[in-house]
């Protein structure tokens, strides 16, 4: 799933470490999400959106897997 996490984080002037601490996750988790190698849990996705004051769909872009009906 694509996301705008890096863009939002950098706009706030935050490091990956600072964001990780604020969200209660590791820096490696932030790196993996930003690179699209890890899709966060729904709970974490909502925490990220809430942290930045945006809607979840403003952070995460669902591209679909071609199996939608």
Regions found by a protein language model. Name each.
Residues 17, 28, 57:
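Key DNA-contact positions within bacterial/archaeal DNA-binding proteins
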Residues 43-58:
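DNA major-groove recognition helix of helix-turn-helix/homeodomain DNA-binding modules
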Residues 35, 54, 64:
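Short, conserved catalytic or interaction motifs in soluble domains
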Residues 25-38:
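Recognition helix of helix-turn-helix/homeodomain-like DNA-binding domains
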Residues 4-22:
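Short basic helix-loop element that most often maps to the first helix and adjoining turn
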Residues 50, 60-69:
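Short, charged recognition helix plus adjacent turn
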